[in-house]
Amino acid sequence: MKLANIKVVGVATLATMCACAFAQEGEIAKWDSRMAIESAVIDTNGVKWIDGKYLPIEGRAFDDVEHFYDRLPANVTTNVNGGVRGMKHHTSGMLFRFKTDSKRINFKWQPYSSVISMHHMPSTGVSGIDVYRWDAKKGRWFHVSTGAVKEAEKRGSLSVSWTPGTPCLVNLPLYNGVREFKLGIETNATVEALPPRKSGINKPVVFYGTSITHGGCASRPGLAFVNRVGRDLDVPVVGLGFSGSGVMEFEMSEHLARIDASCYVLDCLWNMGLSTLGGYAGRNLDENYEPFIRNLRAKRPGVPIVMAEHCDVLCRGPDSTDRFIRALYDKLVAEGWKNLVYLPNTDMYSGDGEGTVDTCHPNDIGMESMSKAFGAAVRKALKLK
């Protein structure tokens, strides 16, 4: 095996958008060309393998992390529930966007956890990757292939023929993390970051919420509604959905506020209750929501915030938690708050039960309708045409 030169142009991470300036690990190649050379190795088949740490990545909002692909910083304290602290290793919402002149692209990755699937969500969604190509004539991303982790090997691999110069997007696993990721290209091929988006939105839309925001239960990563909104609106996203654990602790508002976002989307109601109705310790809307949103607005004044109701499979209208945040929304608007968008659950599901796997979590049909509802709210918040 020998080292090979690699041209990496404009590599950047969303971590540059954090309020605190950290050394950009993903930009090492930009500052030290020797590191870029050493990061690419040619195997016996003539494939040049590049570590994912040197690829243009999005959805990775922090650099002060325990593991490179973590969604939250290493200093998350016990003031945040254990579910979040454990699932911060999941790569939901993370993706690579780049252009290459290689005629074939190869991928291999090692998942963080050996649990690669769930009873109601396949391994392709939990631990797989999705590859998309940009169609310039039609002005949209098209799905090319999905890579899965082999149960026996506990590793994933995928090889795809490619039209040189075509932009590529790779969604990472939803309910698993990545310990190692590598892109394989032809020996003399190059990789370049894509130019700024035509939408004009280059700061991320940050989604914070529950298992549904996390991506449960899409059959593959690209179909999760957060990822669909990103592609459909041509905006970068950060996915901070935490299964059963999106409960709006005050500390989480501090972490979100560190991200230099274009918009925040709050979608936590499924994991929360009301103290007046028995509630749940540490999970009550009437205790957590208002301090959370006020702190977020204080730290990021002027950044639009979307307040979402909880999705209801049967579309029965607002429940007590929805009515609570509607009253809070009206209160904040009366105080003079601007750039605040309210998202009712009216269009999140079709109402016929076809959009869910278990009367709660959306399947791919449900994810499509969710993406349209949330996409419309984000479009309104960002004033996109």
Regions from the PLM with identified roles:
Residues 202-226:
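Catalytic nucleophile-elbow at a beta strand-turn-alpha helix junction centered on a G-D-S/GDSL motif
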Residues 211-216, 238-244, 271-283:
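Surface-exposed cleft-lining segments at the edges of enzyme active sites
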Residues 1, 5-6, 89, 250-385:
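Alpha-helical cap/lid subdomain in secreted, periplasmic
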